[in-house]
Design a protein with these regions (language model features):
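RNA-binding accessory domains that recognize and position tRNA/RNA substrates
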Residues: 1-119, 132-176, 244, 292-297, ...
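Active-site adenylate/phosphate-handling loop in enzymes that bind or generate adenylated species
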Residues: 67-68, 103-115, 182, 186, ...
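Generic secondary-structure signature for well-ordered alpha-helical cores
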Residues: 73, 166-174, 212-220, 267-271, ...
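Hydrophobic/small residue at the entry helix of a nucleotide-binding pocket
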Residues: 126-127
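A conserved beta-strand->alpha-helix junction
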Residues: 164-191, 279-281
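A short alpha-helix-loop-beta-strand transition element characteristic
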Residues: 270-278
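The feature marks non-catalytic terminal segments
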Residues: 277-328
């Protein structure tokens, strides 16, 4: 109908029907007015996306509001812009006008994909899904890499990460999960390297492999879930010792958050209940009795010389399983 009207010769413009909008507003407000005991404060708020519209927002508010008041003020309706109990909202576009009265708050942030792709190291714990979600809120399309150790841990961790990736993917779509077999690397580190360095050495290998996947897949940064000082591997010295193995940027959204805040966010996004299902993750295998808290890079490099780490990483990369999370 609108297009037909606009194609009529001699028709200079077309405007929203204030009478029709007012009738709709009355239909919505009247039941609320009755349920509130015939006393309700209301206002009209207009937003003009089409700035060419001839009336200003306050003028539209007056046109619609006065019509509604003429009908409902005898029944107890009053205008109160600052303390309105009911708000009728109008958005005027170039081709249509939308009227609504219930604005639900969204997640805000930036549109997914507008900031590029990142690759998140996803475990079965509480923290890493929250990191992934926070990066999605900043406009990143988040892909995932999981370091699997089924020979030592069974399939439980694998299935758990599939569930977590699916939950995070609800906020973005088109995420990809890369599953890396990690058992050979962990076995070599366990058998040949100093026990106290195990966890940091695991992480260095993970970062190297993740960086290579990110480069091949087109992700511009890695995302991890470290929170400074939360566990022994997350001291400044250990984070530096891990980060130095790659030139790819590493984002740590949780670095200044405490555990309570992270848990609260996990509950909000629906990942907490999955994360707390008992299941050891990759880094918990062969945990040292006294893990190093202030590792020295030369000592780590000396440990790595004891194993064919480049060949082990290349072999793991050749066996990566690629899963489209949308298909889960």
């Amino acid at each position: 109908t609108e297009n037909r009207v606009l194609r009529v010769v001699g028709m200079p413009s077309m405007a929203p029907d204030f009478d029709a909008i007012s009738v709709l507003g009355i239909q919505w407000i009247e039941p609320r007015l009755e349920s509130s005991g015939n006393s309700l404060k209301f206002c009209v708020k207009t937003r003009r996306a089409a700035k060419s519209f001839p009336k200003t927002s306050p003028e539209v508010n007056f046109e619609v509001g006065s019509r509604i008041m003429n009908k409902l003020s005898p029944k107890g309706l009053s205008v109160n812009i600052k303390e309105a109990e009911y708000v009728l909202e109008i958005e005027i576009g170039s081709s249509e006008t939308v009227v609504f009265d219930n604005r639900e708050p969204g997640l805000r942030g930036l549109p997914v994909g507008s900031s590029g792709n990142v690759l998140c190291l996803l475990s079965g714990g509480i923290d890493s899904p929250v990191s992934a979600f926070m990066m999605a809120c900043r406009g990143c399309r988040v892909h995932f890499v999981f370091f699997d150790n089924q020979p030592f841990l069974g399939r439980g961790g694998y299935d758990k990460v599939l569930s977590l990736a699916k939950k995070i993917n609800h906020f973005q779509a088109r995420g990809i999960l890369f599953v890396v077999p990690f058992q050979d690397i962990q076995g070599a580190i366990r058998d040949r390297c100093n026990e106290e360095n195990r966890v940091v050495l695991y992480r260095r290998m993970m970062y190297r492999i993740a960086a290579e996947i990110a480069d091949r897949q087109g992700s511009l940064a890695l995302v991890t879930s470290e929170s400074l000082g939360q566990v022994a591997s997350q001291t400044l010295e250990n984070l530096a010792a891990v980060s130095c193995v790659t030139s790819v940027s590493v984002f740590r959204p949780l670095i200044g958050m405490n555990k309570e805040s992270i848990i609260s966010r996990a509950k909000e996004i629906g990942t907490y209940e999955v994360s707390i299902v008992p299941q050891p993750d990759c880094c918990s295998v062969f945990m040292p009795k006294n893990p190093v808290t202030r590792s020295k890079i030369p000592f780590l490099e000396r440990d790595e010389e004891k194993i064919p780490w480049k060949e082990l990483c290349d072999d793991a990369l050749a066996k990566v399983e690629i899963i489209k999370v949308d298909d889960l």
